[in-house]
């Protein structure tokens, strides 16, 4: 409980109050869930099937470390090498900024690589709220997976380097598609973004302000936030202090007023009335926060 309170931010309340059931479904970014697929040959076949629908960007939110399965590895590499769409693959960045890439990255220089935010600066015990655009590694600038996706989809995109932004979980809903249903979404995938990853298993599940979400969904929402500049901006600290002072002042004044006007009223009723007024003021505070979130 203590950890939960320590990790709480006002933006969490804002996102929690958003009705996710009424959010529009994104018509630009989709997630293909390959949780049920356990071998690289089958994943390669799924990638090829997605590529046949002519998406603009295919993002692989899966790490492929080197191993002994040479035949499956060769099929996967051949598939990636023949796809005309822009392919973005995931990598991991350690605390000392060393990059862990998939085995095929050196052999396929046409692929774009981006580090995944879900394994960077976050742990399973903390709420995943933010994504980063880039990290600077000595003289090199490494781009994140969401940024690489956004740039592949919208090359003229403007972004801030080395920035950490809140993910907008309240803007759109990301449709998850099973491999068996890819053909049904052929028209919707055309010229759009398709993120392929484990979207329903516990292997890539993360705590967010709106509940548990998979890594591919978080990547998709981060990319959507970047593409449409729907970043959430938290209220400045100084304004929070001012509003906190005003709330406390109004609470004390209300208590004093009720005590003077209704001398026979017990203190419990006075306190409850004052709390009611304070709650109304808190809602005003939330409205102010809303304007800052979308400023």
Indicate residue ranges for each PLM-predicted region.
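A diffuse structural propensity rather than consistent per-protein peaks
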Residues: 178, 223, 293-295
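Substrate-access "cap/lid" subdomains that shape
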Residues: 154-184
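Hydrophobic transmembrane alpha-helices
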Residues: 256, 263-294
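Non-transmembrane functional regions of envelope-associated proteins
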Residues: 1-158, 189-266
